[in-house]
């Protein structure tokens, strides 16, 4: 075994928590009197920062906006965060871990939070589809390299 392979790769979730929540229904109660045919827009963003040697905070920001014509039915924003201990990887592997693997772990928590907030606003159930953070991360890398993202069939 070479010296390069002596560093053992490890990954541990220290904590998963909700960092920020916002729910707005600016046109309630008038919006409840209309036929429910919204256009739903989903925006995602991730950020990470190093807290200590091998300890990282990753924040997944999810914003869901439902509009009916020109009116906003609701706007829901959640920042789901996690603290992760990561050792034995660096460079592109670390970037992938922080930009795709950790957000994959955080997304179900954010989705549940959003679903609950929308239900508490008495809007019809909102089911967010799973997100392919690996594909989003690859697209981000291609944009950073100045390439056009490729579309998969």
Swiss-Prot record:
<keyword id="KW-0811">Translocation</keyword>
<dbReference type="GO" id="GO:0051082">
    <property type="term" value="F:unfolded protein binding"/>
</dbReference>
<comment type="similarity">
    <text>Belongs to the SecB family.</text>
</comment>
<keyword id="KW-0963">Cytoplasm</keyword>
<dbReference type="GO" id="GO:0015031">
    <property type="term" value="P:protein transport"/>
</dbReference>
<dbReference type="GO" id="GO:0006457">
    <property type="term" value="P:protein folding"/>
</dbReference>
<dbReference type="InterPro" id="IPR035958">
    <property type="entry name" value="SecB-like_sf"/>
</dbReference>
<dbReference type="Pfam" id="PF02556">
    <property type="entry name" value="SecB"/>
</dbReference>
<comment type="function">
    <text>One of the proteins required for the normal export of preproteins out of the cell cytoplasm. It is a molecular chaperone that binds to a subset of precursor proteins, maintaining them in a translocation-competent state. It also specifically binds to its receptor SecA.</text>
</comment>
<dbReference type="GO" id="GO:0051262">
    <property type="term" value="P:protein tetramerization"/>
</dbReference>
<protein>
    <recommendedName>
        <fullName>Protein-export protein SecB</fullName>
    </recommendedName>
</protein>
<dbReference type="GO" id="GO:0005737">
    <property type="term" value="C:cytoplasm"/>
</dbReference>
<keyword id="KW-0813">Transport</keyword>
<keyword id="KW-0653">Protein transport</keyword>
<keyword id="KW-0143">Chaperone</keyword>
<dbReference type="InterPro" id="IPR003708">
    <property type="entry name" value="SecB"/>
</dbReference>
<comment type="subunit">
    <text>Homotetramer, a dimer of dimers. One homotetramer interacts with 1 SecA dimer.</text>
</comment>
């Amino acid at each position: 075994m070479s010296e390069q392979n002596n560093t053992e790769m490890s990954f541990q979730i220290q904590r998963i928590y909700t960092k920020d929540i916002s729910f707005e229904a600016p046109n309630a109660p008038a919006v409840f009197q209309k036929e429910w045919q919204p256009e739903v827009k989903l925006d995602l963003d991730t950020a990470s920062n190093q807290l200590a040697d091998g300890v990282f905070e990753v924040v997944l920001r999810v914003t869901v906006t439902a509009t009916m014509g020109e009116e906003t039915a609701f706007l829901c924003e959640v920042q789901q965060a996690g603290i992760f201990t990561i050792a034995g990887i660096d460079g592109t592997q670390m970037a992938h871990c922080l930009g795709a693997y950790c957000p994959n772990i955080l997304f179900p928590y954010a989705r549940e939070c959003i679903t609950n907030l929308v239900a508490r606003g008495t809007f019809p159930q909102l089911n967010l589809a799973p997100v392919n953070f690996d594909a989003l991360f690859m697209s981000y890398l291609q944009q950073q390299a100045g390439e056009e993202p490729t579309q998969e069939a």
